[in-house]
Design a protein with these regions (language model features):
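Catalytic helix-loop patch of NAD(P)-dependent Rossmann-fold dehydrogenases
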Residues: 4, 12, 16-17, 25-83, ...
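Active-site loops and adjacent core secondary-structure elements that bind or stabilize anionic groups
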Residues: 1
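Alpha-helical segments that scaffold the active site and NAD(P)H-binding pocket
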Residues: 8-9, 64-69, 101-105, 150
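Short acidic-hydrophobic sequence patches enriched in Asp/Glu that either
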Residues: 92-96, 167
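C-terminal substrate-binding subdomain of Rossmann-fold SDR/epimerase-dehydratase oxidoreductases
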Residues: 100, 106-232
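Conserved active-site region of classical short-chain dehydrogenase/reductase
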Residues: 4-7, 61, 139-142, 146
Length: 232
C-alpha cells in the first residue's frame, strides 16, 4: 500500500515532520455530533465507503506506530468534505458539491442555448436531500495544514473543518442560486442517503489560532468561476 511506502520512505530519508491527510469518513456512521476526535473506532463505518475509511485509518495508525517506535514526527489531520478549484467534476465519480455545480450549469446552459430562456425542468439528485454535510474550501485547508505544521505535534488526529453543516437540499439551493439555475430538483429516493449527519468538532484546531475564512456561498461562487473557465 502506497501509504506504508510513503510513510516509511519519509522516516528513512530524514523528513523532519510528516502530515498525513485522512478523512472525516474514518468516523462511525452514527457517531455523536459534532464529531470529536475520540469517536474514532467507536462504532460501525458507513458501508458505502468503509474500504476507503479503513485505508485511511491504517495510514493514521501507521503514523502513530512510527512515532511510538522510532520517534518519527508524523501528525494526522482529518479534513471534512473538501471542494474548490481543480475539483473533479466528472459525474461518474465526483463528490456531491462539484456534481451539483456541473448538473446545474449544464441544465441551465443546455436549455438556454436551445430556447434562449430559463431552465424550467428539474435535475435528478440522489436521496431525499435531508442528510447534513460540512464543506471546507481547499484554501482554508491549506492554511490549516500550515498552522498544524507549525503548532501541532500530538500523536492523536486533529479534525479540520468549519464546524457548520447544511442539508443537501440547502446546498443544492445555494448552488442553484450561484449558477442561476431555476429548474428545481427531483430527489431520487431510490438512491441511498448515506450517513444522516456528519459535522466535525473543530475546537482543537481552532485552539491553535486557525479559523476558516471562506463562506460556503463565496467558495461555491469561486469554484463555479473556475469550472466555467476550465471545465465547461
Amino acid at each position: 500500500m502506497y501509504k506504508r511506502q510513503l510513510i516509511d520512505a519519509a522516516y528513512r530519508n530524514g523528513v523532519k515532520k510528516l502530515v498525513f491527510l485522512g478523512s472525516s469518513c474514518i468516523y462511525p456512521k452514527m457517531a455523536k455530533q459534532p464529531i470529536t476526535e475520540d469517536e474514532l473506532l467507536s462504532g460501525y463505518l458507513e458501508s458505502s465507503n468503509d474500504a476507503y475509511a479503513i485505508a485511511k485509518i491504517a495510514g493514521l495508525r501507521m503514523c502513530r506506530a512510527y512515532r511510538q517506535q522510532y520517534g518519527f514526527n508524523a501528525i494526522s489531520l482529518m479534513p471534512t468534505n473538501l471542494y474548490g478549484p481543480n475539483d473533479n467534476f466528472d459525474l461518474e465519480n465526483s463528490h456531491v458539491l462539484p456534481a451539483m455545480i456541473r448538473k446545474c450549469h449544464e441544465g441551465k446552459d443546455n436549455v438556454s442555448n436551445d430556447i434562449g430562456g430559463p431552465y424550467m425542468h428539474p435535475i435528478d439528485l440522489w436521496g431525499d436531500g435531508s442528510p447534513m454535510r460540512e464543506f471546507l474550501h481547499v484554501d482554508d485547508l491549506a492554511e490549516a495544514v500550515y498552522t498544524c505544521m507549525q503548532k501541532y505535534d500530538d500523536p492523536e488526529p486533529i479534525n479540520i473543518g468549519t464546524g457548520e453543516d447544511v442539508t443537501l437540499k440547502e446546498l443544492a439551493t445555494t448552488i442553484a442560486d450561484v449558477v442561476g439555475f431555476t429548474g428545481g430538483f427531483n430527489w431520487d429516493t431510490s438512491k441511498p442517503n448515506g450517513t444522516p449527519r456528519k459535522v466535525l468538532n473543530v475546537d482543537k484546531v481552532k485552539s491553535l489560532g486557525w479559523e476558516p475564512q471562506i463562506s460556503l456561498k463565496e467558495g461555491i461562487a469561486s469554484t463555479y468561476e473556475w469550472y466555467k473557465e476550465n471545465e465547461a
